[in-house]
């Protein structure tokens, strides 16, 4: 089980880097859901968050409905060797980011076991790099509809526009 701060950052990265939503497992965390929803309410976009009690059933259901599973792990194939094939596939994607002890079944259920380097590092970094490569950098200029708050890029200082 990852800590609350790491979970929050993982979900914020998913949202900011272009994911449509997340399924999360472990324990129901209403505070986590509220923190992320507040960001969506303030900063815009549509981002769905759903608790899933049984990760294995969710993964199997995703596959049976025609989707593909992309598991980010340091033991997988290097992203640079497979990202183009993943990008070109029309199937809906479920990206799985495991914690410290990923069950061996996950490696078997995944269509793709992908490494973002074959070194230990953060699951937040792995998701960031994967989404950046998947979207070919276009997520960096993504527009978020219904934003109440917007940053105005500055050479120096900070400027935020807040709409009521």
Residues of each region from the PLM?
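RNA substrate-binding interface of SAM-dependent RNA methyltransferases
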Residues: 1-74, 135-140
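Structured adenosyl-cofactor binding patch, chiefly the S-adenosyl-L-methionine
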Residues: 106-155
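Glycine-/small-residue-rich active-site loops that bind phosphorylated ligands and cofactors
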Residues: 2, 28, 102, 119-122
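Long, charge-patterned amphipathic alpha-helical coiled-coil/hairpin "stalk" segments used as oligomerization
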Residues: 76-116
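Long, charged alpha-helical interface segments
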Residues: 155-164
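Short secondary-structure transition/capping segments
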Residues: 33-38, 82-84, 126-127
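Short, well-ordered alpha-helical microsegments
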Residues: 32-33, 55-59, 79-80, 103-104, ...
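Short, solvent-exposed amphipathic alpha-helical segments in soluble enzyme
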Residues: 10-13, 39-41, 86-88, 111-112, ...
């Amino acid at each position: 089980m990852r800590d609350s701060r790491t979970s929050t950052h993982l979900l914020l990265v998913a949202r900011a880097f272009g994911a449509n939503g997340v399924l999360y497992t472990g324990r129901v965390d209403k505070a986590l859901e509220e923190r992320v929803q507040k960001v969506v309410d303030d900063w815009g976009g549509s981002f769905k968050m759903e608790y899933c009690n049984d990760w294995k059933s969710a993964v199997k259901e995703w596959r049976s409905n025609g989707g593909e599973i992309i598991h980010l792990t340091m033991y997988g194939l290097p992203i640079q060797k497979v990202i183009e094939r993943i990008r070109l596939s029309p199937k809906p994607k479920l990206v799985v980011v495991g914690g410290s002890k990923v069950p061996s079944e996950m490696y078997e259920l995944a269509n793709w076991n992908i490494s973002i380097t074959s070194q230990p590092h953060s699951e937040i970094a792995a998701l960031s790099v994967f989404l950046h490569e998947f979207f070919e950098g276009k997520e960096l200029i993504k527009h978020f509809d219904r934003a109440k708050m917007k940053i105005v890029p500055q050479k120096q200082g900070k400027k935020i526009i807040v709409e009521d």
